[in-house]
């Protein structure tokens, strides 16, 4: 028989930097899960990634205090800011532009995000990324 699921926990954890401090500790502790076991497993899985890159993770907690977790791709906004070389988006996105993004950069981000996007093909994914960039006040060239 399958294990009984008691809940899901959604967190954004920096790659390679999971530790028992908030927000991880309290979220897992409430469900009675082994915090250090998750931290070690997460850090091992994110070893090859850029340290500090926020990784969304969905933890499935089971009744027997065990768990599994699924890592998603980093948020599009983080990847866009990194590619455009800006610290944060514009306060007035449609009037003040803070950076530029080329089509090649948008395609690279779309390829990274493809597993989590609902886009039908790469072109649709690129347009989705371009729309996110525009809403952050970043000009997109070639789209």
UniProtKB/Swiss-Prot annotation:
Classification via Pfam families: Ribosomal_L11, Ribosomal_L11_N
Keyword RNA-binding on entry: yes
Single Gene Ontology MF annotation: large ribosomal subunit rRNA binding
Gene Ontology process terms (BP): translation
PROSITE patterns with a match to the protein in the record: RIBOSOMAL_L11
Protein modification: One or more lysine residues are methylated.
Family assignment from sequence similarity: Belongs to the universal ribosomal protein uL11 family.
Protein name (Swiss-Prot/TrEMBL): Large ribosomal subunit protein uL11
Underlying gene: rplK
């Amino acid at each position: 028989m399958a294990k009984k699921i008691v809940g899901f926990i959604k967190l954004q954890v920096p790659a390679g930097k999971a530790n028992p401090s908030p927000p991880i500790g309290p979220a897992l502790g409430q469900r009675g899960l082994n915090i250090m076991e998750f931290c070690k497993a997460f850090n091992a899985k994110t070893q090859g990634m850029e340290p500090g890159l926020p990784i969304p993770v969905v933890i499935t907690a089971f009744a027997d205090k065990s768990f599994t977790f699924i890592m998603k791709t980093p948020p599009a906004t983080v990847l866009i800011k990194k590619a455009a070389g800006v610290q944060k988006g514009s306060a007035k996105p449609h009037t003040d532009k803070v950076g530029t993004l080329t089509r090649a950069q948008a395609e690279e981000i779309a390829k990274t995000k493809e597993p989590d996007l609902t886009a039908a093909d790469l072109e649709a994914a690129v347009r989705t990324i371009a729309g996110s960039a525009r809403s952050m006040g970043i000009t997109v060239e070639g789209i």
